Amino acid sequence: MMRKYLILLILLPALAVGIIPDVTTTVGDMVDTSYLIVNCRADIGTQELPPTKLELSSDKIKFTATDLSSTSTQACERSIVVTKTGLNILRVAGVDEFGYTAEAIDENKYIASCVINDEDKINRVLRIKITHPAMFDYTEWVCKTTASDGVETTARGGIDTGAILFDFENSDMELRTNGMKKDKKTLPMTFDCLIDGPFKTVIKQEIYGHKLPLFGVDMVLKKGNGDTSRIRGELFGRNKIDIDETPPLDDFTIRKESDLCGDTTRLKEITLAATNNNEFAANNIVIFLNTGFTNDDNSRTNYHNDQKKENAVLDPYRELLKTECFGRHTKTMVTTPINQLQHDTQCFRYDFIGSAQFISDNGHILAGVNKLSLHGGLINPTEEYDLTLNWEEDMDFQTERILLEMPSKIGAIYTGVRTGMPLRVVIPTHNLISDLYKEVAEAMVSFNRMEIKMLKLDQNKIAEVSCNSHKPFFYKAIVIMQKGCWIDTIDAPSRCLNTDDNRAFKVVTIEDYTFYLRRKIHSQYRDAVYGRDMDYRCMGSYYYCFSDYRRYNKLRDMVVVEQPIDTKLTNTILAASNAKYSSECVQDNVENLVQADFNVKGYTDGIADNLITHINTDLNMGSTMARKFPIAEITNSDVKCHCGQVVNTCNRYSFTNAINTLGTIYQPNTFPLVLTGSNNRESTMWCESMGFRSPIKKAKIMAANFACGGSTTPFIDFSDDLLNYLPTPIFTTVKDLTAAPEKRYIIECKDIPTACLSESSISINIIMDWIYDPPKTQSELGLDSEPEATGKTYKSKRVIWQKTNGPIFGGEFKIERASFYTNAFTNQPELYKNTVLPEDELFDYISDGYTHTFFKTYFPENEIKPTSATCSYGKINILKTATITDFSSWITTDKQVLCTGSNYQYNVKRIGNKIFTTDVTWPNDCPSVDNVKIELLSNNEADLLYSVVCSSQGTAIIDGLKTITYSEDPIPMDSHMDGNVAYCIPTDNGIKVVLATNLRDEYVNSLKLRTGYQINELSINQIDTAQVDTLGQGCITPPRHYPIDIAVDSTGIPQSFVFDCTIPEYLQSSMDTNPATCTSFPEVETVKLVIVYSGVFSSSVKHTIAMRGRTKGPCSGLANTECELLPQVNGLDKGIRYTIKDIYFSNLFKNTPGLSVRAYCTLPNIAETNTVTKELSKTMTRIKLRVPQNAPPETPHYDTEYMYKGVNRFYYYMSYTVLGVVVITILTMSIILCLKFRVKMKLSRQQMTSTGEGQQMLYIHAEV
């Protein structure tokens, strides 16, 4: 019988079964080319026909190959058909949404190929290479073959992501139809006991099968005589942690009676560091498995299995930065002093645009330096180097501006590294990165040309650095290499030193004035520990060559942009981003220049002229000044903000259908340190991992969950910081006029986080004076007569009622709460209505958990008077408290507190034909409306066209999917259709929602409008639906901060700048459709143009330019200007066109050193704080300041070119004038000297008439 079987082979060669870490990084983009290979193989007997079809599929995509009979791989590959089985239903998540990222569902990341073998082992293989694998790419794959006789055979398999932490005995993990084979690998590690003795210890990690334990540890203690005893590590009460459980972020500790090293009286702690501890040795070498001991003096001793030292202590490892805003949450230590969490922590931007796209979009101003990077690959001097991975770059800096994208300041962060034989990998520290980019920045200032080249090894395994240029003059090479290496010009082989001190890396520069730079790096050596050549990489695989020294085209500006921390590094096992992101620290005062010209949100700053001078000075003085000029001074782009460690939002519920596949990227779902120094409770946080984006969590909710639910004992020192995020309880005392027969007062303790409504975390104490005589019982006073509120109930809290004279009575304090908060419009969470969340997560996402939680107690008027009250919640070390000691000032009279729907005014109107508005107002005495919504539906109400929900808390939900924080600005409803916007207008006692559409007039009347409002405290949910054509006309209320669009043209009309200030069509249409009773809206001609300029030594100056009437003509407010109405669109005025002659800007250039100019448009009564501003400084440098062709020139006074010619002629004539003065002066001095000489000669002759000697003297003098 013909034997057929399939093999689903998932190859991960980096760890034998791990992702290939073939990472090419570019600064800013951090391109990760790690990939996963999936093979579907059919083995064929020598007498069998090839199969007719091979299929390899996942739940997202399927590949089918049908031409398998020939031996041509090209024919096989041409027959491959790709079918999307699930990708078509995936939707890319927005920046603040939960779901898939665009990279994860990009079908171009799948590369299909065929492998055919007809020799020793005949087979047909369908191979899929997956770049940037997402989590679902590791799940089950199905391989199905159809034989020539029609028989189908299927094999299934996948990768449990937890397995990739470990090495395996075989290079391939095979999943066959006849069962999965088991792989087993023991990872030994030997270290010394803390106390000297004849014992050795061996740590083993045993791995069986496909589903692997993450942190199951067997500790085998081996005595000198060969006897062994075993301790199974108790990890938080268990000896193993399953793959679907969350591993600890910190070190886990095994405590045992330490009688193994000669000490039977004390407990010793043996600490095994987890793989994501990110601990570094002092010499930049990663520690892939680390064992630490806590000594009696609280010092730490570390042993590593790549350095077999006995009874020796390594240098203290360098801790990562304790605070990395928007970066990885590194390591939390209980003993971390509070002074390490100062408020000047570096914050990294989260929304930086990748360098490749960035350069492409801005090629007119930026040089192509996007490939500048610290490459992970290193030269191995003892082995042949694979030159197929060669990548080099050669670029000339043609522009006057260079963009230099800086790497993260903390260096590489590794979440896991491969185990097995010793592997030493360079981890660039902050100093190494600073040294490299300092030298690169200096070289960019001084040279026009840069080459990024690969080191070449000659036959003696000596690396060669060479630079050449078509303009030989001066060269500079920058190389990363081990300290033990050296540079020479000879070819003789030599060896690097191999001491610990020389294992660190350094940045070396080579400078020379020559026609060709050529140097040898000597790196061959023999390892002193093992006595043989080791796999040790001594040099950075790439180096930088700079040539063509800048003489004339000096660099004007260097724009430095810092990228966020990116964890897609060479030796991370998954090589997948697990970054934390936050809305905190995004700068509100970002330069408009950056937004407009660079399309990147983040702070950038050019290098000042004096700073470039300092760079050149440093370059000329040599390397001795390197440490005096750190890279931070060059970048000058630090944005300081108050932040601490980042809150983790990644937990097991973050990713749909991936609960058991997160593996190494699990981190605790706790809230250790939260943005210390900031009180912004509304800051949002999320994480992205392996192609998925987690839901958003607010800092205040995570703080409440942690303070009232999590274990806070280790973080008691940071309780003050946590309290910043918790609301202070609010006391209110109001009179209830609805109670019969007696009036009574209600004391409310509001604003309690829902997570804190448990008996162990709430305490309230109210002390009252008893003024009723004779005393009444508690029941008679009505203290406990109120029933429990409907909905979710809570246990009663006991308080003590105290009276001035008489007995003390005990009373029951009732807890009341509004009905369980859901969205009344849909009965499900609007934000995540397409996501199924577990029960314990619902509350976080459905409600803020703050606004509808309160306690009430009632007391009759004139019978009981409260004197003090205290309301607290939280735990003993994190307790939020409010205390009231003077109630007399709180008591108000005749205040209605129990409102009904009749107290709320609710209106729905239509403005013109396509604008709709709804508003709700209420009295001061009534609770606020929580949400107001407006929806546009099809006539049969089956299709929802547009939906916006505005809340009283400052958020808006768009189309039921996206929640944003609004600032009373227009919210785009549909990016594919212009003119569809909505905005919210909140007041102290009202909310108004405006929806403006751009639909066709004949289509609008057939639609329906659904509106409503929601009051959770009163359980009021008002929802109404009406036909659009039945709505009454209302008045438009413009948004308070609408930014009027501005367009600038400086190329179409020479000697002029043209500004178009436009108003959106929906606001223009409302001008004509508002009824007479409405407040008149500003006319189009009232749009104003504002130009603001400033200089280095001058403050800002603002010019406001306006149109005079509605006819074309000179503008008011500035000379040399012209105003006209823009052409109409749909019969409506679009705005105003302002034309300003360049003489205005030329004068600014001439009279304002360091000129910075920007412009924006405004309407009356619309604030200028949120305008769209255009930066003009760089636009002005591109304008043609010359006379139009075939046109008579203006007078020199008004023409810039003539003005420049006049200056040149002035200098021309002045030069001749000065030359003439110099000549006349020389002639005059010559004449004077001649006259003096003549007088002297005359006197001499007079003396010669008296003596012969004088005649002889004269004769001798004449001879001379």
From Swiss-Prot:
Positions of transmembrane segments: 1215-1235
Main location: host cell
Protein name, entry field: Uncharacterized protein ORF77
Signal peptide: 1-18
Keywords: Host membrane, Membrane, Signal, Transmembrane, Transmembrane helix
Membrane-protein topology: Single-pass type I membrane protein
Lineage top rank: taxon: Viruses
Any Gene Ontology CC annotation: host cell membrane
Subcellular location: Host membrane
